[in-house]
Amino acid sequence: MSKNQNHEEYQDDARPLTIEEQRARLRQLIIMGKERGYITYSEINDALPDDMSDADQIDNIVSMISGLGIQVTEHAPDAEDILLSDNAAVTDDDAVEEAEAALSSADSEFGRTTDPVRMYMREMGQVDLLTREDEIIIAKKIENALKNMVQAISACPGSIAEILELIEKICKDEIRVDEVVEAIIDPNEVLRNELGLGHLETTAPEKPSNDNSDENEDDEESEEDADEISAANLAELKQKVIGHFAQIEKDYKKMIGCLEKHHSRHKDYLAYRDAIANKLLEVRFATRQIDSLSSSLRGKVENIRKLEREIRDICLDRVHMERDYFIQNFLPEITNLQWIEEEIAKGRVWSNALDRFRHAILEKQTELADMEKETRISIEELKEINKNMVSSEKVSAAAKQEMIQANLRLVISIAKKYTNRGLQFLDLIQEGNIGLMKAVDKFEYRRGYKFSTYATWWIRQAITRSIADQARTIRIPVHMIETINKMNRISRQHLQETGEEPDSAKLAELMQMPEDKIRKIMKIAKEPISMETPIGDDDDSHLGDFIEDANNVAPADAAMYTSLHEVTKEILESLTPREAKVLRMRFGIDMNTDHTLEEVGRQFDVTRERIRQIEAKALRKLRHPTRSDRLRSFLDSEDSKL
């Protein structure tokens, strides 16, 4: 259906639209967008009711359409943009299903609140809980999508080389093995599990408890044992990984040798490539590592498209080559450096203009050819690999999103137990959601337990870690937080049993720790308080105003020192100028430092003995009652302080 037909249909009636008519318009718009791959803003405006003027609601609908993989543009894109893109065609049935799924969220945009918290709670409640069978189906979707991504990545020799470089770093202990590989999967064990012949794990995951104090205690007691088990498991995993990738490296060298002798379609090359792919499928890579490899491959394809667009712009906008002719003749010869010479030799209308831009086009073609040599496969094969990888990424992301949305209520139920610990409730939910996403990445449905049982540990760990890292102004390590919690729990228990607060000695006995360490823990456990805390009902005074500053002089002392300075100055002025200056220099009065007899003698050009005589005479004058009585009061005040 054309745009004009849509516009005429939307403008048939000036009456207010019913909910069903609004749904029908949005359904038709989404179906058209899925079939074409794009929707223009004018088509969205035509589909919306005339009385909708809220910009937030319109933006939410545009975001919903974009989230379905439909490109929202100002104008219809060019044919070559559609051709160079990876958007696959969608069948009518698929478009209708996605439109119906999207309409359930679009209904909430007509006349409802746009408050993010209310929207979050409301939309969370609309998602149905998953059964064990539903969780297995979603987990298999994620697993198959990851396998397809690994298979797509393994089809690129450059990506295999990157993986082997990482394995070499593992051998040299430059990186941890679990940063790259989580496990080596035994295909026979997988088959037994699929047939129901395998045995479930003997140790079930930790079950959630309603008592948070017990959870913290159990976590603390098992921390050292868990570290020892983890170290042993990592050492065992490292040996498995090194042995597994040794065979992959041998096949890779044979595959590269075959590629150099023949081509990427040769049967021997394909056999080695499939053997490597099968070996890589037995490896469960870390999600972050798969994302890194995918990003590397995606970056190469984006660079290829950028160079293609630059060549297209030169040929179409500057050389004025016909668009259909360019698409038909250039794309198959994209890395053929003789293509431009052959086109110039044909003597077409644009041949002279093409000759002027010969070097610019050759430079970009050379970059494409170098990239082809680097990846060891053709540009078209690299694009096809990227297309398969992007398709698998979308499937994996959609399945993970479904699993996450169905378990958001679990996060809230756990976060409620950790309120009043220094973080806002919404922050706790956010941190719990991060733990939920990690649980989705690491969930293994073959172990036999439900996802919620497994995710509880990840959610609780994410929340407790965030409280330890962010709740206090001065950060305390997580293990010390656990020790403080244990000490507080024992202290409360002792208070309930005896009615008395335990002292440091009693806590040391109960916790079986040295008393000096208990004192340090009690000192660390004190919460900081702001110096701007108001004191009293008025806001005029703060806590900082009542804290003594040892670096400042007390007002009484400052007044005494000022008075002493004035009296000393008056008494010295009663002496002769020479005697006053000698005393000032000898005792450092109004000077940076005192001076020796030798230094004062050089100042007056006399001997040190003469200076000593002048000093003794001046001090005798100061001892006269008319002068000494004025200074005696300051001496008495100093003695009273001592």
UniProtKB/Swiss-Prot annotation:
Residues annotated as transmembrane: none
Sigma-70 factor domain-2 as annotated region, ranges: 403-473
Pfam families: Sigma70_ner, Sigma70_r1_1, Sigma70_r1_2, Sigma70_r2, Sigma70_r3, Sigma70_r4
DNA bind region: 597-616
Subcellular location: Cytoplasm
Renumbered ranges of motif Interaction with polymerase core subunit RpoC: 427-430
GO-annotated molecular function: DNA binding; sigma factor activity
GO cellular component: cytoplasm
Region listing for Disordered, in residue ranges: 199-228
Keywords recorded for this protein, A-Z: Cytoplasm, DNA-binding, Sigma factor, Transcription, Transcription regulation
Sigma-70 factor domain-4: annotated span: 571-624
Regions of compositional bias (Acidic residues) in chain numbering: 212-228
Main location per the UniProt record: cytoplasm
Coiled-coil portions: none
GO BP annotations listed: DNA-templated transcription initiation
Function of the protein: Sigma factors are initiation factors that promote the attachment of RNA polymerase to specific initiation sites and are then released. This sigma factor is the primary sigma factor during exponential growth.
HAMAP family the UniProt entry points to: Sigma70_RpoD_SigA
Family: Belongs to the sigma-70 factor family. RpoD/SigA subfamily.
Protein's recorded name: RNA polymerase sigma factor RpoD
UniProt source species: Neisseria gonorrhoeae
